[in-house]
């Protein structure tokens, strides 16, 4: 390619670029001698990917969204940490040319998630950092397992550390609970809801996919979902469905349509409307048809009756009173999907740490007369 053409080539949108304001807040040290103890340890401690024994997995891509910018989310997370001065603790204690190696350690059992996002964050902070993973997103890790390492400028590793861990711990917590619920609910599929952390919608939903769940609607734009308030304002479930069909036909939109039902009578009314009209209805939500009992068990008889009434004509979704203890019994009713807001609104982060190699740090201290 001629030089002029190469210069005119647009930037790759998939390559993360460090925001100009952030660039001055991280360190980019000059190259170091290949004979240094750090380069030797790099060769010893970071095996080539071909020699790793991690379970191979096809990477799980984040959900698609027309306006959500994952790069901007990463930049925001870094900016709120860096402020207008950068990491003053690192600036005070660590020379800019010091290299270090840090290890990711699982502090408890669970499903790891956020590895792909961590790669993006490290690249955003310092493209020269070398990152190696011994596990993949979606793999099960045990307490004490070292599942990844990062090597390079010590300051920049520490700048990235908390942002990487905040995302990874949250995503791993979501993925761990999703995996447990998905396994218990089979053959029904587990869905999350829109009850996600503000600004982290795609990150939370990405973690659900990594954990083996499926995504409900991403936002208000990709599915028509008629809930109790819509039904109340529209004057009933039949009127609401009629208005939806008219709207989609007028706007020439082909979108999935879900309607929330709370009683068997509402299910019957909806089925009667669907039998008499050319409708866009695709899924019926069966809300709070799982009834808690005083002994800790649940009564799913109403849910079973609703599933039998629908008889496969539409997808079904159970919602309400869904927990890790109840999801198996709910899944046995024959519903297509089970949705749980708790997957993302009540997540317990998985404990993960990133530790700099102590022996390496002591060598740095001796070399800089700081030990």
UniProtKB/Swiss-Prot annotation:
Pathway assigned in UniProt: Cofactor biosynthesis; NAD(+) biosynthesis; nicotinate D-ribonucleotide from quinolinate: step 1/1
InterPro entries attached to this UniProt entry: Aldolase_TIM (IPR013785), NadC (IPR004393), NadC/ModD (IPR027277), Nicotinate_pribotase-like_C (IPR036068), Quinolinate_PRibosylTase_N_sf (IPR037128), Quinolinate_PRibosylTrfase_C (IPR002638), Quinolinate_PRibosylTrfase_N (IPR022412)
EC code(s) of this entry: 2.4.2.19
Function description: Involved in the catabolism of quinolinic acid (QA).
Disulfide bonds: none
Record GO biological process: NAD biosynthetic process; quinolinate catabolic process
CDD domains for this protein: QPRTase
Keywords of this entry: Chloroplast, Glycosyltransferase, Plastid, Pyridine nucleotide biosynthesis, Transferase, Transit peptide
Enzyme class: transferase
Family listed: Belongs to the NadC/ModD family.
Name by which UniProt lists this protein: Nicotinate-nucleotide pyrophosphorylase [carboxylating], chloroplastic
Transit peptide (residue range): 1-48
Taxon lineage: Eukaryota, Viridiplantae, Streptophyta, Embryophyta, Tracheophyta
Any one GO CC term of the record: chloroplast
Entry's Gene Ontology molecular function annotations: nicotinate-nucleotide diphosphorylase (carboxylating) activity
